[in-house]
Swiss-Prot record:
Residues covered by the 2Fe-2S ferredoxin-type domain: 4-96
Protein name: Ferredoxin
Organism for this UniProt entry: Trieres chinensis (Marine centric diatom)
Positions with a binding annotation for [2Fe-2S] cluster: C42, C47, C50, C80
CC terms in the record's Gene Ontology section: chloroplast
Pfam families: Fer2 (PF00111)
UniProt remark on cofactor binding: Binds 1 [2Fe-2S] cluster.
Keyword Transferase attributed: no
Source taxon at top rank: Eukaryota
Keyword hit for Electron transport: yes
Amino acid sequence: MATYKVTLLSEEHDIDATIDCNDDVFLLDAAEEQGIELPYSCRAGACSTCAGKVTEGDIDQSEQTFLDDDQVGAGFVLTCIAYPKSDCTVLVHQEDELY
């Protein structure tokens, strides 16, 4: 099991934090465990409440069913079902940017 440094950013919500996240832990869960509140609703990858956007690094979100190919290609992720696969940077609170 690998552990990665995940930087979570949201200028609007005053979030600039780097957390440790194992490669088998969802980003949302790791953030909550380390005291960072992020938006969520379904926790199943079936809505867009927890959407983020990866600006650096690799994420595995193969369990998601909501985002279309264009959104995934643009770097959007659902933090409730996304695992880090490298050190990465994720803009959080991005649901409004999806549309």
